Amino acid sequence: MRPARTDVHDGLAYALWLPEPARRAVRGGVVVLHGAGSCKESHYDFARAAIAVGLAALTFDQRGHGQSAGPMDGRAIDDVIEMASLLRLELGAPDAPVVLRGSSMGGYLALRCAERVDAAAVVAICPASASGLRRALNDGSLRFDADHAAFGALLDGGELQPIVAQLPMAILLLHAQGDEQVPVQHSRELATVLRAPTSRLIELPGGHHRSIQHDDELQAVSLRFVEKALGLR
């Protein structure tokens, strides 16, 4: 199964996935944010799972990745907001319910952007911390082209715990206990400040940094969570 369309918007390469037209207007959509060094195609499996339950999905290459223009820089948050607006345009309503789903760095950005996007819910998989991303930026271990000054400035003062503590929407945190890149303790600390009663943290015993994002069962768990958050279950 292929995307309904692949295109470039404001320098951002994206793939749009649409369910059957008869179901499109009532189900909402998901903007999928990949991790550092990844690309939109890596999350086509989740996009296919989303359209199977009647949700639209939009995956895109963040700057410094894939086919998008320019390095990762201070536009990262505005780019997510723009992609959410584009998905709402495709859904035919500026207030269409949109969920953010991100992995690692994408999980960080999903939580960081949730309020400005007016996200209906967030699914954050092994979400990175601002300090962890800052260290990786400084030591050169991030595997993508970045404007160090601009992206570093975006990260500075952007730790997630105080941000998450202010978010009213349902948030699902998924984290492998054996994650060798982002310690599970980070998600445990975020879980202590979740506000919505339907929010939760699911820990996967063992595993590693990439265990969860492509796991069929956990993708299904994520989509059930999204459907409930959107009032579709």
Where are these predicted regions, by residue range?
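N-terminal cap/lid segment of alpha/beta-hydrolase-fold proteins
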Residues: 1-23
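Short alpha-helix in the alpha/beta-hydrolase fold that links the catalytic acid
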Residues: 169, 183-192
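Short beta-strand/loop motif that positions the catalytic acidic residue
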Residues: 166-168, 173-175, 179
